[in-house]
């Protein structure tokens, strides 16, 4: 599963870990992306989305129907 939110587009951040002796190694900070199922009443079916915690708040605020419309307007297949 990729670590990209389908609602917000949030993806991993990259940087360096710095040890006590200042050796630097590459690392990445993954967003909290979960695979969640949502019911679409207009279509009478459930869809599965990869959603970050901020994406869940957006769905709670705007509603699943409008969020799915925006995702489809971007050209993503659901």
Swiss-Prot record:
GO molecular function: structural constituent of ribosome
Alphabetical UniProt keywords: Ribonucleoprotein, Ribosomal protein
GO cellular component: ribonucleoprotein complex; ribosome
Cysteine pairs bridged by disulfides in the record: none
Renumbered residue ranges of the record's region Disordered: 1-28
Protein family (similarity comment): Belongs to the bacterial ribosomal protein bL28 family.
Descriptive protein name: Large ribosomal subunit protein bL28
Organism expressing this protein natively: Corynebacterium diphtheriae (strain ATCC 700971 / NCTC 13129 / Biotype gravis)
């Amino acid at each position: 599963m990729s670590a990209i939110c389908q609602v917000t587009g949030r993806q991993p951040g990259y940087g360096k870990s710095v040890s006590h002796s200042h050796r630097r190694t590459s690392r990445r900070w993954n967003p909290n992306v979960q695979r969640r199922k949502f019911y679409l009443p207009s279509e009478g079916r459930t869809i599965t989305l990869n959603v970050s915690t901020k994406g869940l708040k957006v769905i709670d605020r705007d509603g699943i129907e409008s969020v799915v419309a925006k995702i489809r307007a971007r050209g993503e297949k659901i």
